[in-house]
Structure formats: C-alpha cells, structure tokens
C-alpha cells in the first residue's frame, strides 16, 4: 500500500459473508456492516504475502468477487491514480482509472467502467439509493478535486457508505480479520508456479 493510499470494497452481502471473503484472501481487513453493504477496509499497508504480491490496495482492487457477493464496488487512491472498480452478477469487473491529470483513462487490458456501468452496478443492490444517471456522468468530468476528494465525492453522490473509512476520519473500524493460513498457502502456491 502506498504512503497516501486508501481504499474500500463495498460488497452487497452480509458482514459474515464479507468476513469469509476476507479470510479466503491474503489481505488483513476490517469489515463494517451497513444496511445495504458490507464495507471492507484494508487493515495494513501490506498483504501477508511476499513481493511482488505485498501491496494490499493492489490486491484488493484486483481481487475476484464471486456473484453471491455482488454487486461490488471498490474505491482506491494509489500513488497518482484513483481507481473505481465495479462488478455485478457474473459480469467481469470493470475499471475506471483517474490519472495524475485527473482525467478518466482506460487501463491497459482492463474492461472500462463507464458511468452507465457504475449506475447499473449500483442499481443491482435493492438497498442502494436511486441516483440519476446524469449525476454519475458528472463525476467523470470532475477535475477540480484531488483523487481522495474525488473518491469521497463518488461515495457521497452515489449514496454509498464508507466515506469516513475512505478518507481516514473513521477510527472505529473494529477488529482485524486475518486471512486463513490455508488461503495464504494456496495463493503462494499459485504465484510460485507462475514465476517458475
């Protein structure tokens, strides 16, 4: 995780399901319950695995979310990039990257997340607030905010929880949920095979 990095993953699932998802991963996290979402917040800057798989935010941003936990929305500030990910049902995760110049750009080999995609993802959670599409589109044009301010604005406009966890003002994040050792061993076995 970077010096200024922050991130949250919102899952349309119970907190028990979110805790299980964290335990099957490699990043220690806090899990906060909300009426419509479970909020997953990395508890550390690093995962429990060795480099190059040690950046908690990168791993959370790219982590697969199964259809039982979707829709899922991830919001991350990493170095000079803001990242929004969204996944609904069995569709692939889609990505919006906000570059250093504060413009939304396509990621190489990443399915692009459009305002319409994000709007559909949000609508997939019956507990989510209905947001006019024009408000979602307007977010893509906001270049007056820093990356973290922009991500908090996305959360605010979409009526999502987690803004205080994202900006660092919520200090009561609850216990740290640690990954299961078997999940860590399985991950390390897979990446070991990739690098041999």
Task: For the regions a language model picked out, list residue spans one by one.
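Long, compositionally biased intrinsically disordered terminal regions
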Residues: 100-196
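Hydrophobic alpha-helical segments that drive targeting, anchoring, or assembly
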Residues: 2-140
């Amino acid at each position: 995780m970077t010096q200024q990095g922050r991130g949250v993953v919102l899952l349309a699932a119970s907190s028990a399901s979110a805790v299980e998802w964290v335990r099957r991963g490699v990043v220690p996290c806090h899990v906060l319950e909300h009426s419509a979402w479970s909020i997953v917040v990395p508890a550390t800057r690093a995962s429990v695995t060795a480099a190059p798989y040690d950046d908690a935010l990168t791993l959370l941003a790219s982590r697969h979310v199964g259809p039982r936990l979707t829709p899922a929305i991830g919001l991350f500030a990493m170095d000079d990039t803001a990242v929004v990910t969204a996944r609904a049902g069995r569709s692939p995760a889609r990505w919006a990257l906000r570059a250093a110049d504060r413009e939304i750009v396509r990621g190489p080999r990443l399915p692009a997340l459009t305002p319409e995609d994000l709007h559909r993802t949000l609508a997939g959670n019956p507990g989510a607030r209905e947001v006019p599409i024009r408000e979602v589109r307007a977010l893509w044009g906001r270049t007056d905010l820093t990356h973290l301010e922009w991500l908090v604005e996305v959360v605010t406009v979409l009526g999502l929880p987690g803004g205080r966890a994202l900006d660092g003002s919520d200090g009561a994040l609850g216990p740290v949920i640690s990954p299961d050792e078997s999940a860590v061993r399985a991950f390390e076995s897979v990446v070991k095979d990739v690098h041999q």
